[in-house]
UniProtKB/Swiss-Prot annotation:
InterPro entries: His_Pase_superF_clade-1, His_PPase_superfam, PG/BPGM_mutase_AS, Phosphogly_mut1. Pathway: Carbohydrate degradation; glycolysis; pyruvate from D-glyceraldehyde 3-phosphate: step 3/5. Transmembrane segments: none annotated. NCBIfam families: pgm_1, PRK14115.1, PRK14120.1. The gene is gpmA. This is 2,3-bisphosphoglycerate-dependent phosphoglycerate mutase. It is an enzyme of class 5 (isomerase). Gene3D superfamilies: Phosphoglycerate mutase-like.
Length: 244
């Protein structure tokens, strides 16, 4: 048996302002800093001590990993970063207010863009592509998205799962993945075999560790949040985003 922990980054400044964030590199809010620290405290209290961390190239996830490791007394463990764990690219919606977008385009279109499995938002223009960011300098231009649906996130995340995370799990390491709402939804979809339709109803709260116990074939034996009551309340708040 091996342990995998998924941790969505703490609240970001754009989460607080109800904006679509995607690949924009926004840092944690004051609340988010506390959430990330509390996530690490929950790990320590549960005796779930990471041996290795995988995170994205975005500051809010990296800082969450740092704060959680510090609170858990595990600052020395290796931290591996990959663009494949980045948040879903929200295309032309990035930077827009969710409530205003809902009002402008209507409930049906808003939910299609936000929660459907295979409907991406409008693309950004070539002048906005994240390739101008030096963190993606070694990434082939055709891999840098202009928009993504969740299916696209699954497609780019799974190679990293198999090539980087699975070997750590098979070596018996306790693995922490500190990432984003949609990159973690993509991973949960894979782990729990959630259908393309049902995944629309999955919401992952910020800063609360989700623990999986996996068998030798990496099948799920059990899973659950380390603070179930807080997770249920926070997930409901995520589902309600878009409302003023």
């Amino acid at each position: 048996m091996t342990t995998l922990v998924l941790l969505r980054h703490g609240e970001s400044n754009w989460n607080r302002e109800n904006l679509f964030t995607g690949w924009v590199d926004v840092d944690l809010s004051e609340k988010g800093l506390k959430e990330a620290t509390r996530g690490g405290e929950l790990l320590a209290e549960a005796g779930v001590l990471p041996d290795v961390v995988h995170t994205s190239l975005l500051t809010r996830a990296i800082r969450t990993a740092w704060l959680a490791l510090d609170a858990a007394g595990r600052t020395w463990v290796p931290v591996r970063r990959s663009w494949r764990l980045n948040e879903r690219h929200y295309g032309g919606l990035q930077g827009l207010n969710k409530a205003e977008t809902l009002e402008k385009f209507g409930e049906e279109q808003f939910q299609l863009w936000r929660r459907s499995y295979d409907t991406p938002p409008p693309e950004i223009g070539p002048e906005q592509v994240s390739g101008v960011d030096e963190r993606y300098a070694d990434l082939a231009p055709d891999l840098i998205p202009r928009t993504e649906c969740l299916a696209d996130v699954v497609a780019r995340m799974l190679p990293y799962w198999y090539d980087a995370i699975v070997p750590d799990l098979r070596a018996g390491r306790t693995v922490l993945v500190a990432a984003h709402g949609n990159s973690l939804r993509a991973l949960v979809k894979h782990l729990d075999h959630i259908s393309d339709t049902d995944i629309a109803g999955l919401n992952i709260p910020t800063g609360i560790p989700l623990r999986y116990e996996l068998d030798d074939d990496l099948g799920v034996l059990s899973s659950g949040y380390l603070d179930p009551d807080a997770a249920a309340s926070a997930a409901a708040a995520v589902a309600a985003q878009g409302k003023k």
